[in-house]
Amino acid sequence: MHFHGIATQAVLASNITTGSGRHVSLSDVKWTLSSSALNSTVPASLPSQAHLDLLNAGVIDDPYYGLNEIDLQWIAQANWTYTSDPIPDLLEEYESTWLVFEGLDTFATVTFCGHNIASTNNQFRQYAFDVSSALKECTGGPVVRIDFASAPNTVDAIAADPKTPVWPVQLTAQLPNRWLMRKQQSDFGWDWGPAFAPCGPWKPAYVVQLEKTAPIHVLNTDLDIYRQGNINHLPPDQKQPWVVNASIDFIGRLPAEPRLLIEIKELETGDVLASQISDSVTLIGTSITGVTTLKDASPKLWWPSSLGAQNLYNVTITVFNKTEEVARITKRTGFRTIFLNQRNITATQLSQGIAPGANWHFEVNGKEFYAKGSNFIPPDTFWPRVTKQKMTRLLDAVVAGNQNMLRIWSSGAYLPDFIYDLADERGILLWSEFQFSDSMYPVDEDFLDNVAQEVVYNVRRVNHHPSLALWAGGNEIESLMLPLTREADPDNYPKYLAEYEKLYISLILPLVYENTRSISYSPSSTTEGYLSVNLSAPVPMTERYENDEPGAYYGDTDYYNYDTTVSFDYSIYPVGRFANEFGFHSMPSLQTWQQVADPEDLYFNSTTVVIHNRHYTSEGYGRIENSSRGMAEMTLGVERYYPIPDNPDSVANFSAWCLATQLFQADFYKSQIQFYRRGSGMPERQLGSLYWQLEDIWQGPTWAGIEYDGRWKVLHYVARDVYQPIIVSPFWNYTTGDLEIYVTADLWESAAGTVNLKWLNLSGEQIIDNAGTPTEIPFTVGAINTTKVYSTNIHDLNLPDTRASILTLSLSSQANLPNAAVKTSLTHENHFTPSFPKDLELVNPGLELSYDAHSGIFTVEAKSGVSLYTWLDYPAGLVGYFTENAFLLVPGQKKKVQFVVQDGPKDQDWEWQSEVTVRSLWDQKSSTFLYALRVATGRP
């Protein structure tokens, strides 16, 4: 985005490593943090960052609270030193001693035993330093000291160097010059998050001592599983046997004549699929590689969520020689092929009505599928406090939301293995990216060498995960930065284009191909695709760049439009092969605001609220003029389409406004998702919808569907609904009055069923003669396809009053889910009003809510009118979601809903169920909700 429970025998970690020697975790050693800006020393941790240690020491308050980001900017401007206590029991008689850092953020100087060991400048690399000689010269206990320089000050100094290149256009959020560092780019601010620019030893570190006999320690492993003969940009031959290529990166010395044993066991049963000594072993530098072909084995395939089972295997790689085992490592993996098809449309496809151009969709195990999902951003500014528990809740919500793919946006950070592990278990495909975003970047030799080390390490580290779906070069470089650069400096554009190709195509592409044959590569997140690939050429991929061919479609789309006058005009949505970004921002809930705002700041345009809104960004801290524009966009979206909250209680009114912005956001996304999914049966053959964005980095107005603490916004519930396997959708041209009803399915077989249509007035009474509309329509929809089941014009219907009418749509079908042997009953409900919600003559629905403690079921009933956007809300103090929410309810209908508790409550005696509330669109202007709000939020 740019600025404007598994089986008990499962291996839960990605790998288990054994080798010779000693391994001392530096997390078990005491640390201190100091700085001249602090004038004192505080206890510290590893892994950690300076902000977190200052918070734990009571030096600072919650960085996210109120205006603390402004007050705490001094931390980013200071240099910080982490110092360990003496490390016990390190012995000089070992063959060698190494300091290994899984991650240092970012500009660091490492000292050991008083000796300057190295300086680092890349947050995303693993570093291993031989400190053997320093240990032998140590006069006291071995101490590690890490000096971190201020990242903002460091890059500003680099920028001030006359030799540093300057580009005609660069996109800056709060802090400038982020493109000059290999550090999480959003640490300098983005339009959904703060600019804390943290520093520290953000990942684990340890000391390794290696013995004189067979001294080796495994640093990284590349496990590549693919079909024989596979090439990254070509479709795998599913008839070919599986190839397992295992490569180990190590420190130390291998003994003579090393060999590799590869053993594969099914995770659930422990059955051995294969156990083979590699036919050949290659030793290059400090990497040993072996390969084996499974000619007689047929592993169970791994499938994404809703497409089949997530079958997993443990692969154990053992390095040995004639006399002993040297090292053993176990990786959990799965057998699948994943391929990004960017090939030209074939004659067969043309004969099927698919428009000319090129494909842009994913295929898993040889089957094309519809990708449904969202974009993942860093879940916290401070990665060391991102826990497995939090990510488990988040990825469970992804699956519950009917999503099968997440795009891991750059530039945050490369995900830790445990998040890939969770995705492997749940069948969530992870489109992954290298950490470049919305900027041009240097291409000097030092920068490229630094990037090369980063790329190789991370590609190899995560390659064994079956959830890995793609490597993309960066975010919006081709689709945004190249056009902006050409517009700003057309005379020098060829130079900048060559720089783009040098980094993303000539450098990164070959590195990806050299380290994996199972994953496709795209130089940019949004692209028109390629014309040709020649791996022996200096620029091995020839990009298509901008396509001007009428009637042809190339590449994926990225769409943002903040002109709310056209938000629901689907004729202006982009028509393409795949939608990888689209969205609009909204406010989080009142409960979330209460985490970071004082009670007197709980109103729409308070300083705290506006400061926490980063759309649009302003360079520097505390500037709100651009932020106010983003607040105004949300306001206009509500005022144009929804009842305007007007509650005399200021906090109740604030809560209603927060919800109103979420209603607009959810409806806008719903409109687009339905449009893109319908495209699967249109000439564009559109096969992907990934909205912006899944979750929040902090508490503030953003594009997220899930708030910082895990609370679902309206968006996530609505997206879950329209991401169901088969849906019925209305498409209304509000200018002409034309109304079309479509059924869309992403199943792999055709499905048949019926759609029931019923016109009601807002009191819930059926309109005479169903307003001239049939009550039941049969349908058949093809595999991953759409079909129009009905069309009319609103002006031709017998509606007494378009402001008091609603069309309910109910679909039922019996169909085969992918890889399922028996048919499943599938249903979907939708509705349509021939007037926007603000113009409707709403009737008090008379909502009643009850709870059965025995069954754990909430029952909602509308007694006197149609309830639009029926919204169940739960109190602060726990995290979870309702099995249904934001639904339509008509009189006589009882909706039974359960609440899935993901975390809490801490007080086991708290009967939180009594504090669950329900409201609807009717309540947005009403004061009747005030009492329930007070109960839910603990207000007097």
Curated annotation (Swiss-Prot):
**InterPro entries the record matches:** Beta-gal/glucu_dom_sf (IPR036156), Beta-mannosidase-like_N2 (IPR054593), Beta-mannosidase_GH2 (IPR050887), Beta-mannosidase_Ig (IPR041625), Galactose-bd-like_sf (IPR008979), Glyco_hydro_2_Ig-like (IPR006102), Glycoside_hydrolase_SF (IPR017853), Ig-like_fold (IPR013783)
Q: Which residues are glycosylated?
A: 15, 39, 79, 245, 314, 321, 344, 534, 605, 626, 653, 733, 761, 785
Gene Ontology cellular component list: extracellular region
Task: Spell out the Pfam families in the cross-references.
Answer: Glyco_hydro_2, Glyco_hydro_2_N2, Ig_mannosidase, Mannosidase_ig
**UniProt GO BP:** glycoprotein catabolic process; polysaccharide catabolic process
The record's function comment reads: Exoglycosidase that cleaves the single beta-linked mannose residue from the non-reducing end of beta-mannosidic oligosaccharides of various complexity and length. Involved in the degradation of polymeric mannan and galactomannan.
Quaternary structure, per UniProt, is: Homodimer.
Q: This chain belongs to which protein, by name?
A: Beta-mannosidase A
Please spell out the taxonomic lineage of the organism that makes this protein.
Answer: Eukaryota, Fungi, Dikarya, Ascomycota, Pezizomycotina
Which gene carries the instructions for this protein?
mndA
